[in-house]
Amino acid sequence: MKLNLLLLLAFLSTTTIFNLKAQSTFKLKETGYVGALSANATADWTTGWTNFDPKNAVYGAPTDTTTLNGMLSTLTVIGEKDITTTVTLDATKVYLLKGFVVVRSGGKLIIPEGTVIRAQSDLNSTPKNYASLVVERGGKIEITGTSTKPVVITSAKAVGQRERGDWGGLLIAGKAPHNLLDGTTNNNVQMEGFNNVTFDANLAKFGGTDANDNSGIVRYLRLEFGGLAFEVNKEINGLTLGGVGAGTELNHVQVSFANDDSFEWFGGNVNSTHLIAWKGTDDDFDTDNGYSGLNQFGIGVRDSVYYDGTYAAASSPSTSEGFESDNEATGTANVTPYTSAVFSNYTMIGPVPVGAKYADINSVTKAAFRRGARIRRNSSQRIVNSIFMGYRNFVMIDGDSSVRNTNYPSALTLVTPSTAVDVKSKQISFANNLIVNTTSAYTTAGDTTANGLIEVARATGSNAKLTALDAWLRQTGVLANKIDPVAFTAGTVLVEPLASSTAPNFRPVAGSPALSGANFKDNPVLNNLFTDTKEIKAAQVAPIYPNPITNGSLFFGRQVVSYGIFDMSGRLVKHGFDTDQAEINNLTKGLYFVKLDGKVQKLIVQ
């Protein structure tokens, strides 16, 4: 035994000589509270770097008008400026962003703490000035703001003149999998709006097979007034992530006044923490085409003044949601990877102000804003340990494929096929959430599709589905949601969650139901996605094989709901769902811990 231990220690001591490959350093943190914040003021992660009144923020005039200027007449292709080497910005300067600035494969853009970039677009120029920052596959961006010196990318307009859509946005294209097809592959799908960029037909294509792909670091960043409409009804999101892999670091990002979605993921599996969507236009957090990352601690706040103007369009109307999630466009194709992202500890504030009723808001707001979460088109989205308040309806399970993904017995009898999804890892999870305001939300006599809590698609049998899914959300037990435990009035849940405030406070008040109710260990989706040092110390050898392993597949010997692989500090470096194996080709040599069915086993990669 002593000899084996010495050999193990000797092996571990040699692992430091190998070059580190990019891999996820994400770890879910177990909390007792639900929502984004605890009651502890000193632990308020929104302090120092956020700005909830960017229309009136004072920023310096640009002092560098060339480094990030894609409209210079001296460029080979006017309209875009390529970064092919390492370019490091200087935080003592204020940069003007015009045209596309494109970080090509092999290039790197480093934006240090405290840097301010002011963006100016012009779709009437020739060529068009799209004022956007694009990171291509193989390129890297390193945004390294801090809690006291964030990086800010904002409008170039003056105080009081800034508005949604003043510039494009930040778009990152990675090599991770998604479920869109481009002919026979999924490696060259182009982001929306770029197909008619006349001077570069191949810009912003994403996808590949590297789930651990590394596009860089995005840390302590504010994105303000993005969402330029490249074409009619084709606005750019505040932050767009296409096929971005788990090797990318993403945390502490505030998107304010986006002219489309604040955040949107197209496939990929990048993990994140501490995201804020402030007064966006369409959806706060939109997941599509096989996105399967883990996300913890986030805030979404709606203002009734800002909504998607196509809500009443005769063709393809779009309403503004908190979460919107799709697997693929039809909702019927069984394409993989599945959209199965996890969002835990989110605080979602709808357009109905605290103390008001849905009936009190104007008719346009009633029509434009709909749900706290819309899960549709065969998505398996998971939203847990979160707060929802002030919405018209709180959850919509839209379409039979997503109704089936609930695996709720009385709902399964109403869809075809009526069998449960193959394994529970494809099952939607909406559990341990605090939901406030259903009794004063949307109600209308005789409506068979919505009741203020749950909504279903308008179709044959909608009333039966509504009844079944209402029961699904009201299940009791360790995964129960708290529904209307307190009145929707000031001082019952959060300190100051109003969108009208320029200094909101999303911490729970004394006695708030948000102070408790989170559950990680009993949720079959979550219980393999976090660990602690006690579990690592108590790890016992179990029959995963081969072990040790050099590369290829690690086999579990059975199908598992989910798995997590952790490094020695307890950081989650790889995870997956609905599988009997894990690919470990991109793991650095060393000692790891694999968690299956709530139990931890040692793994050596050599």
Q: Language-model segments: what does each one mean?
A:
Residues 1-24, 531-533, 555, 591-600:
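Bacterial Sec-dependent N-terminal signal peptides
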Residues 21, 513, 569-571:
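Residue-level recognition of short loop/turn positions
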Residues 21, 82, 90, 96, ...:
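Short, solvent-exposed coil/turn segments
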Residues 23-530:
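Beta-strand/loop edge motif enriched in small/polar residues
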